[in-house]
Amino acid sequence: MCDEEVAALVVDNGSGMCKAGFAGDDAPRAVFPSIVGRPRHQGVMVGMGQKDSYVGDEAQSKRGILTLKYPIEHGIVTNWDDMEKIWHHTFYNELRVAPEEHPVLLTEAPLNPKANREKMTQIMFETFNTPAMYVAIQAVLSLYASGRTTGIVMDTGDGVTHTVPIYEGYALPHAILRLDLAGRDLTDYLMKILTERGYSFTTTAEREIVRDIKEKLCYVALDFEQEMATAASSSSLEKSYELPDGQVITIGNERFRCPEALFQPAFLGMESPGIHETTYNSIMKCDIDIRKDLYAFSVLSGGTSMYPGIADRMQKEITSLAPSSMKIKIIAPPERKYSVWIGGSILASLSTFQQMWISKQEYDESGPSIVHRKCF
């Protein structure tokens, strides 16, 4: 384990995308969809060197003849056979490494069930024979990536959004809140409101097009009502987008109506507070003495936090909820799409972290429950 040559592997498994690479790097080497596809009909692919399953981009490109499954739902692994396939693909096809030669740092969702952490640990040691491993909470890694150990993280990806208050490097479980509203829901919502404009997007292939429109053209309005008025009175907010078939569509108020659902979940028919209120509620569940530190360092992380305008809007909304004397700072690092992975890369390469790994020997002595004693 003291061998300097062997880089640790860092794997951040999200509901939508898997990010993987080597500790010490400043960005993940591999980023691919967290999907496993199986042929719908036996014998359709005879002579194509048919495999019984496909992972990631290959599954995505062959989706016409496959049944696609996401083994991670709302941040939590629900299908271990498929998850194992994703890890296998990560090590052998994407990173091209032998997992038995590298320590592996995995990430987990906040409030991940205990049994899940044990299962991850077991698969790493028993299936992949890793020499050492560690499981870290995603939001905590995002905070490390921003160079702090105390703050609140609003981590929003494809499948789930969490607000996680962290004090001196430890997530405070009683104050963590989960919102089942994230990127996938916003893509669905954009499909719906584009349909109202007369464009038809229904198939899974078309859904990918809408996701691209969302990522390229959507933004968060600072004042929603005012933006709606501007959009109604002029065409200044309209943008055009060329579909793969050459047809050009025009999109106006949909650009900011789509991500507005993060602040007004009622748009999606959900009776829950928006991301600003959820963040505030998380802070209010914490001890009164640390709230000031949380308000002063509120970090946005994950792919769904990438909309232009989101940080200014969060600043405005939280300022109106918080006590008037409170200093509020929203941090939105440019690389926040990958900040969980980056935090993992930083953590796994710290010299002080090297004694934190769970070794194969410790696992053999204690079994999977060792993870609760060493990773918290």
From Swiss-Prot:
Top-rank taxon: Eukaryota
CDD domains found in the cross-reference section: ASKHA_NBD_actin
Principal EC category: hydrolase
Residues making up the propeptide: 1-2
Catalytic activity: ATP + H2O = ADP + phosphate + H(+)
Gene3D superfamilies named in the record: 3.30.420.40, Actin, Chain A, domain 4 (3.90.640.10)
Gene Ontology terms, MF aspect: ATP binding; hydrolase activity
Similarity comment text for this entry: Belongs to the actin family.
Position of the signal peptide: none
PTM annotation (N-acetylaspartate): residues: 3
Identification of the protein by name: Actin-2
EC number: 3.6.4.-
Main localization, broad class: cytoplasm
Classification via InterPro entries: Actin, Actin/actin-like_CS, Actin_CS, ATPase_NBD
SUPFAM superfamilies: Actin-like ATPase domain
Keyword flag Nucleotide-binding: yes
One Gene Ontology term, aspect cellular component: cytoskeleton
Keywords assigned by UniProt, alphabetized: Acetylation, ATP-binding, Cytoplasm, Cytoskeleton, Hydrolase, Nucleotide-binding
Function: Actins are highly conserved proteins that are involved in various types of cell motility and are ubiquitously expressed in all eukaryotic cells.
Pfam families attached to this UniProt entry: Actin (PF00022)
Localization, UniProt: Cytoplasm, Cytoskeleton
